[in-house]
Amino acid sequence: MTPDDKTGGSIRFAPRGVPVIIGVNRVGLFALYMKEVRRFLKVQTQTIWAPAFTTLLFLVIFTVALGRQGREVLGVPFASFVAPGLIVMAMMQNAFANSSFSLLSGKMQGTIIDLLMPPLSPGELMAGILAAAVTRAIAVGLAVALAIGLWPGVSLAMTHPWAVVWFGLMGSLLLATLGLATSIWAEKFDHNAAVTNFIIAPLSLLSGTFYVIENLDPVFQWVSRLNPFFYVISGFRYGFLGASDMGPGTVLMAAAVGLLVLNAVLAAGVYALLRSGWKLKS
């Protein structure tokens, strides 16, 4: 016998074990996405415009120090060579910063239950956080491009737009996934800072943003080619300049596919961690 409601109807509940929401919880997924987006938009001076200003300073310093007397790299002025790498580097670093803070802040503030209790599957939770991180990366990329465009002598004309879009998204997604993994593992903000300072920052700065690896010793060239950030930055730069130090076109396409595979593997690993509840529910 089912209890009657005030309107004379009946309140019917699904049998135990039968899901009420079938398929993707679109409303919950969108709500999580908007929560994460609004979180970084509330402090957009710090999360979007500050990275643009910092990146512009990088461009000014390195251009003044290394780009004098009309120096050219890959057939273009030094400033135009450095600019694409700075843009995508800022995108990746901010994608990591956004997703690495999502779950960690809940752990530290005791509000992690607000993310775990809603009827969101591990895949939906992961998708919402990663989508917001990529959104911030795109916003930062546009802000950085706008700031860099103010510097004289920089050309941001795109030769291969598909490469700009593909490598920009793959790089942002790569760092967003790594950030989410860090957010699951970290137990305090010091852990997150350690990953940022000792892993993400070195990989970013040693990825060929400010130089071509052909000028390095063969051993360091080999080490650089083991760095996935190198392929993101070189591919992104290829989209603007039509040239890169990665190698022939076959290497470029292999890098594009390789980044997709790497992202898929990392995403599968992070999904498994979320599903197990490791360091979240225990």
Where on the chain are the PLM-derived regions?
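Hydrophobic transmembrane alpha-helices and immediately adjacent juxtamembrane helices
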Residues: T2-W162, W166-S282
